[in-house]
């Protein structure tokens, strides 16, 4: 069940069920001739909460999200990466380094959608509520307002209150609830707009 597609590396990256794939057309017939499983083991607790919404960041990283009932255990060259419940993923494709943030639903109970602005700042959306989040502050590890010393401990502390993942809480709201986020802008706009 495909829930995200992003062009890159001479083909397309695909969020497909419990896997992240790379598909490539090598003979020009517009069909994938090569399929590579980059990672598998993403949570499959509910079909509308699988890994989704993949996007490139300006540094080449791939960003994607997962929903509330996903309990992911992904084997990478850097070890097993665990991420429970709604969360945001970052993959550095050249190194195959996979990192998870906001486990335990710290920033919305059903993350769906990632967008990056002209300055490389990452934002994500929660499909279970009208809130959107500035992702970067919540990625800072090594302590939290609850006194936790790790992201995992912090996720347990924040389970009952996802808006507290970072002191700024939700950055914006959309009405009605949506499952996507996009940043509208262009370098061609005058600065005063």
Q: What role is predicted for each listed range?
A:
Residues 1-193:
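Beta-propeller blade termini and top-face loops
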């Amino acid at each position: 069940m495909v829930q995200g597609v992003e062009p890159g590396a001479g083909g397309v990256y695909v969020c497909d069920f419990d896997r992240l794939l790379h598909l490539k057309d090598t003979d020009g017939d517009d069909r994938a001739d090569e399929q590579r499983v980059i990672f598998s083991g993403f949570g499959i607790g509910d079909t509308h909460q699988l890994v989704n919404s993949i996007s490139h960041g300006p540094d080449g990283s791939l960003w994607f999200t997962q929903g509330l009932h996903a309990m992911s255990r992904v084997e990478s060259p850097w070890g097993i990466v665990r991420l429970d419940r709604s969360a945001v993923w970052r993959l550095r494709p050249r190194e195959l380094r996979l990192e998870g943030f906001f486990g335990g639903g710290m920033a919305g109970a059903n993350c769906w959608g990632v967008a990056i602005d002209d300055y490389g700042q990452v934002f994500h959306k929660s499909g279970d509520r009208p809130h959107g989040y500035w992702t970067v502050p919540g990625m800072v590890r090594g302590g939290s307002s609850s006194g936790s010393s790790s992201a995992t401990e912090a996720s347990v502390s924040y389970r009952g209150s996802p808006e507290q993942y970072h002191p700024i809480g939700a950055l914006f709201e959309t009405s009605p609830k949506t499952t996507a986020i996009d940043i509208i802008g262009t370098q061609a706009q005058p600065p005063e707009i």
